[in-house]
């Protein structure tokens, strides 16, 4: 099995080393194609107006000056040659990708691009917290990643589906279990715009987050609830985002 690994944190991110180790537990034919620089939050963007620059880091290791989507396309359609990959792994992301994070995440997008190319694809993310000193406990992803991947690969992933795996911010021995979940929903009211001034007095802005005064209790069965309970969350996500129920309503309304 030929595995293509990518991420959105960049070619030098520690999580990329973890995903490569996980991949090598499954196969000895592992390739790494990752962004030259941090691409967190770029979602499924594709570079159409800028050329892609490719740099070979070492054997089967390449950096692309582009997005995670660019990396998967370059890896599958150019770097790996005619055979291409059999599996795409994206991650391990530094931080969780839960609920609405899925829309923004370059890690998820790398896996989605693999799915769009007809390849079984997984996104893996490691939560961290103040308790861990903002340092992800990579050992948790390292331990649970291979066994979960093997089981899902054996059963098979439906066409147009990507599997999103999140590991809780605790040591491996503190993990309660593995739960299959659905996407959660959180209050995005804590998004804020931070306005500052440069040395010339001109304004510039950062998008940031305000700490919530009240922590919502996540709905049962969601990825948010699983991580809060120190469980590994495994969420199958569909590429087709059509709201089938509303299709019927609109059809009746607009006919």
Swiss-Prot record:
A divalent metal cation binds at residues 8-9, 40, 93. PANTHER family: 5'-NUCLEOTIDASE SURE, 5'_3'-NUCLEOTIDASE SURE. InterPro entries: SurE (IPR030048), SurE-like_Pase/nucleotidase (IPR002828), SurE-like_sf (IPR036523). Pfam families: SurE. The keyword Nucleotide-binding applies. Its cofactor is a divalent metal cation. Belongs to the SurE nucleotidase family. It catalyses: a ribonucleoside 5'-phosphate + H2O = a ribonucleoside + phosphate. GO terms for cellular component: cytoplasm. It comes from the Bacteria. This is 5'-nucleotidase SurE. Nucleotidase that shows phosphatase activity on nucleoside 5'-monophosphates. It is found in: Cytoplasm.
